[in-house]
Amino acid sequence: MSPDGNREGRIPLPSVDQALAMVLGRVVARSPRAHVLADALGLVLARDALADLDMPPFDKALVDGYAARSSDLEAGDRRLVLGELLPAGATPSRGLGDREAAVIMTGAPLPLGADVVVMHERTHRSGDFVVIDEPSIKPGQNILRRGREARAGDVVVERGRELTPARLGVLASFGCPRVMATPRPEVVVVPTGDELVEPDSAPGPGQIRNSGSTMLTALAVQAGARARALEIAPDRPEALRAALERGLDADLLIVTGGVSAGQRDLVPASLEALGVECVFHKVRIKPGKPIWFGVARPRGDRPGTLVFGLPGNPVGSLVGFLVFARPALWLLAGRPGNAFARSSARLEGPFSHRGDRPTYFPAVLTTTSTPPVARPLEWAGSADLRRAAEADGFLAFEAGDRDYAAGEIVPFLPMG
């Protein structure tokens, strides 16, 4: 073993891609279940949603105006007799009479015989007549035909689609009050360390506030999960194991701190004592090298909890989540495409990378071109969350000493 307790002296640490493949290979997506639309925002549809009727279910007016027969307007006389009033939601009581126009509102069904709607602004009244001032009349003008949006039985939202507000509106309009969708993964965050105090407490000598729980629960929610943080677990084996055991009820457990190789880094041994299988410990990455990943034993028909031990330093924890935990959450939530998506950016200026590990360096995007242009931030390292928080994401520089030129393309890890 190397002096820090890891076997990396004999066995090379996994690369980022190797470690990510190990993570994703252990993910079992949650089984779909029924959700009411009010609870389905952001979920992934598990079955195609079908139209239960034609949409629109009738020929309808697209504007306020007059429903008429276009053939009545082909001759020189542009006057039509005023017929019945048709507001939205009304049903015509009869078809159009000879040279008659019905007063119609947007969304109302057309009376039988009407094949055009003339905008109110292109007409004027003359006693019991309406005079059509529109010079060019074509059949179908200002009309949405029955079934133009969809026919009964058509797929209106495909499975695998994220349920956005607009798609939820589509489902509601086609009579789908409940949908089969992959439920949100449940995430628990357990912060560890005697040096931590909660944000509403004043740190004592040698203490810092717990920023990780707030950041990581927010990241998990942003990735589509339900997330909660437990209280800070102390650096005492029994208390730590009790906190970790509570977290194993979730789909994914995130533990911060205690994963390196110091005498007080008790998390790996505590997790393994609870039956969590270690898949890897430490990755060739900067920041975030001490990351630990394992899988708990299955409970009944429920897959084992995915467990990530992230470094205590905030930016290492942030990078570890974005690189490894977020793709796992996307897979759990039924978003396989997100998990494997890659981005890149063009360097705004020259950049020098030094080090034997790939480095994730915070950067802002300065253009919206394709690929976008990125400028690395002035950054003090893995404890400097303040400046990293201003980033749009992280530029992923390869291991080794290299001077990059302005304009070079570099992999980019988006923050959101």
What are these model-derived regions, one by one?
Residues 153, 237, 348:
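Phosphate-binding chemistry for phosphorylated carbohydrates and sugar-nucleotides
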Residues 2-14, 22, 66-231, 374, ...:
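Short, glycine/charged-enriched hinge/interface segments at domain edges or termini
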Residues 1-4, 8-16, 177-310, 314-320:
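Helix-rich terminal scaffold detector
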Residues 12-20, 33, 37, 59, ...:
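Generic structural signal for well-ordered, non-membrane alpha-helical segments
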Residues 1-75, 80, 336-360:
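Short, low-complexity N-terminal leaders and the immediately following helix N-cap/first helix
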Residues 20-24, 64, 120-121, 154-157, ...:
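Predominant activation on well-ordered alpha-helical scaffold segments within soluble catalytic domains
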Residues 33-38, 47, 60, 89, ...:
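Flexible glycine/proline-rich
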